């Protein structure tokens, strides 16, 4: 049986190992997963309380249009319900956008080190992928603008960026948007929006009034702590959302997921507390890095990226200590956990870098 030729160049997505899988390799002790940027504190207690009380008719299909959830999102964001599209996580929405917009021969433009699903789905649709290197961990919008051409159908901007945690500020993003043709869709992936504390971070939703070619993505998987429910959403012009709905699978968000997201979206106090604790956790890591001259990218997310050598070696050290982090070819990404979890990882990092310095001194004196 034949499939698309371009699939031969792709691999299925490989998530980080689960605690159960880690036990098979590193021994039967407890593991703390700090590899996938999940909320270590879980979801709002209101969600748990309401789901225990409520009864869902399991034999019936869910609301195919996620009407209640979309209306609550629209009301809070001051847009029309018709401007909101809900999906089974942002992964599905990225797939919907790619399938609806891209044709063979088109191209997309994005960063070289960013969320890989932009590239993945473009290749499936037979498109060229133009990747621009990050500038000190940040999207280089000036360079991206220079490679956009008449065949560029989508520019993907992950802001704040995964895996670096860095962000493009309001001035640079606005200037970039003004210079891009309205024939090119600009998708701004704000999966970590709720964690942002920077005062010059762009407020993108007001830009929809002026620019028809902007689509903003957000999720319930990160700050809201609902990753297992798989709920993400896009906000854009009504005409665009209507076209994307043609591609969207029917009944794509389960009744349970819609219920959980609806409740979670109303608990602002929970999000405020999560952001406060996360900011303190980032400060733990940043203080450690500064005190020990370890490079890091200042983060506006719930993770921190250290562009260091021997990432696999650090991963192994953390794994043996019971912590699952994410290694990359050029560094490590660590999800911010509880204070105690952060202290545990920092202790492992401290030992690793002390051993590295000691080894370097020994080699110099040999």
From Swiss-Prot:
Annotated metabolic or biological route of this protein: Amino-acid biosynthesis; L-histidine biosynthesis; L-histidine from 5-phospho-alpha-D-ribose 1-diphosphate: step 7/9
Compositional bias annotation for Polar residues: 1-11
Name used for this protein in its record: Histidinol-phosphate aminotransferase 2
Record's keyword annotation contains Magnesium: no
Coiled coil residues, start to end: none
Lineage: superkingdom: Bacteria
Residue numbers spanned by region Disordered: 1-21
Organism: Bacillus cereus (strain ATCC 14579 / DSM 31 / CCUG 7414 / JCM 2152 / NBRC 15305 / NCIMB 9373 / NCTC 2599 / NRRL B-3711)
UniProt keyword Iron, yes or no: no
CDD domains: AAT_like
Gene Ontology MF: a single term: histidinol-phosphate transaminase activity
Keyword line: Amino-acid biosynthesis, Aminotransferase, Histidine biosynthesis, Pyridoxal phosphate, Transferase
Record text on subunit structure and interactions: Homodimer.
Reactions this protein catalyses: L-histidinol phosphate + 2-oxoglutarate = 3-(imidazol-4-yl)-2-oxopropyl phosphate + L-glutamate
This enzyme's EC code(s): 2.6.1.9
Cofactor(s) this protein cannot do without: pyridoxal 5'-phosphate
């Amino acid at each position: 049986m034949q499939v698309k030729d371009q699939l031969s160049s792709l691999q299925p997505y490989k998530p980080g190992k689960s605690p159960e899988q880690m036990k098979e390799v590193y021994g039967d002790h407890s593991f703390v997963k700090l590899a996938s940027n999940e909320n270590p504190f879980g979801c709002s207690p209101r969600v748990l309380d309401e789901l225990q009380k409520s009864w869902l008719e399991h034999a019936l299909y869910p609301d195919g249009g996620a009407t209640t959830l979309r209306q609550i999102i629209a009301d809070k964001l001051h847009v029309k319900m018709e401007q909101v599209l809900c999906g089974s996580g942002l992964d599905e929405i990225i797939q919907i956008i790619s399938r609806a917009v891209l044709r063979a021969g088109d191209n997309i433009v994005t960063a070289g080190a960013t969320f890989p699903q932009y590239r993945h789905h473009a290749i499936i649709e037979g498109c060229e992928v133009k990747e621009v290197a990050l500038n000190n961990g940040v999207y280089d919008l000036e360079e991206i603008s220079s490679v956009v051409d008449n065949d560029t159908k989508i520019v993907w901007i992950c802001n704040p960026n995964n895996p670096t945690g860095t962000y493009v500020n309001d001035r640079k993003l606005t200037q970039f948007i003004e210079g891009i043709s309205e024939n090119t869709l600009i998708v701004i992936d704000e999966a970590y929006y709720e964690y942002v504390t920077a005062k010059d971070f762009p407020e993108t939703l007001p830009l929809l009034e002026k620019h028809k070619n902007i689509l903003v993505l957000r999720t319930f998987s990160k700050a809201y702590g609902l990753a297992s429910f798989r709920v993400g959403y896009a906000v854009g012009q009504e005409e665009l959302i209507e076209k994307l709905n043609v591609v969207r699978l029917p009944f794509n968000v389960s009744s349970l997921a819609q219920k959980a997201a609806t409740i979670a979206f109303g608990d602002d106090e929970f999000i405020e507390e999560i952001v406060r604790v996360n900011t303190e956790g980032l400060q733990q890591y940043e203080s450690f890095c500064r005190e020990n001259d370890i490079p890091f990218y200042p983060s506006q997310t719930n993770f921190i990226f250290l562009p260091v050598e021997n990432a696999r070696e650090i991963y192994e050290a953390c794994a043996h200590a019971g912590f699952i982090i994410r290694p990359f070819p050029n560094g490590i990404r660590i999800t911010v956990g509880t204070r105690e979890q952060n202290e545990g990882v920092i202790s492992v990092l401290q030992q690793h870098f002390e051993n590295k310095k000691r080894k370097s001194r020994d080699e110099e004196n040999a």
